[in-house]
């Protein structure tokens, strides 16, 4: 667990990301649509796409997303990629599970292209609405 205390439990809200190698005309469009759609008691799931062309060490989660999701009642976030802003997320008490930290955000590195779709993290299929329980 990168931030928060105790057990994280909620219903999966997986997104799909793709690696990009230049800045889009309008960044974060897919991310913002997903952020609008995620709801109370859901877990925002972001697979790193590391086995499908994702080779950037960019953080998939940080303080701004944590703040927005905490105020929406989202249960937490789960990624098999890096996260950033860990001190600020810990201060918020928002539960985030990730594998490492990175100061880089996803702009010009990844784009969220779909949300509330099936995902795979470390060989585990995660479908929208699956119950996720995480603890350290």
Annotate the PLM regions.
Residues 131-136:
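A hydrophobic, small-residue-rich beta->alpha segment in the mid-to-C-terminal subdomain
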Residues 1-128:
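Feature captures the catalytic cores and cofactor-binding loops of soluble hydro-lyases/lyases
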